[in-house]
Amino acid sequence: MAYFLSDGLTKEVEENKNYGGICTIFDEDYPVLLKEIYNPPLVFFYNGNFSLLNAPTLAIVGARKHSPYAKEVLKKLLPDILDEGIATVSGLAKGIDSLAHKITLSEKGKTIGVIGTGLDRTYPRENFELQANMEKEGIVLSEYALGQKPLRFHFPARNRIISGLCQSLLVVEARRQSGSLITANMALQENRNVLAVPGNINSILSEGCNELILEGAKPILRAEDILEEFKI
């Protein structure tokens, strides 16, 4: 509570006023699912279509260095998912994250980006145009105020928001020690549906997904497998 009475928050609100919006956990329109998680952000900043944060949402995570198979999978799955009004959410990182956002936009769908910097920064820099497009066609949000640089501990914290905003989380490709598996575990702890794309048993990029399936994650072979989780 002290944070909401502090000069620091007042300054952050003023700085973000002309850039986008700000939402606190006390606001009526704070995302319902996000509020349910163990450690929801007390404040977050956003730029884009706020209503998407209460839409049916599929989180998509995976390897930063992915194979062509991952692109084929998302191009096959996403059109039917997006046609049902389901938004995608990911972290605007290299690899699967960026791929999911780009394919969603190319299919005229809605996508949510959760970043580990202030909204006035782009990390990685190569996603500058993608982030700008998402602010127009979807929404980008962060619990970090303007000017905040990317710090290592920001990204695990960001992942809890990704899993917190979704009803279901899909892991597309992941190594055995991938950070995507940590996000999947967060989703599981928050009672979200964890889904995984099975892959070649000889590919290190599919080891994490195949092991998730062995542990009980739902294997995804077609879009209908995902839509079932949304009762569609």
Residue ranges and their predicted role:
Residues 1-28:
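Short, small/acidic-rich helices and loops at N termini and domain boundaries
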Residues 25-232:
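Glycine-biased, small-residue-rich flexible motifs in mid-sequence functional cores and linkers
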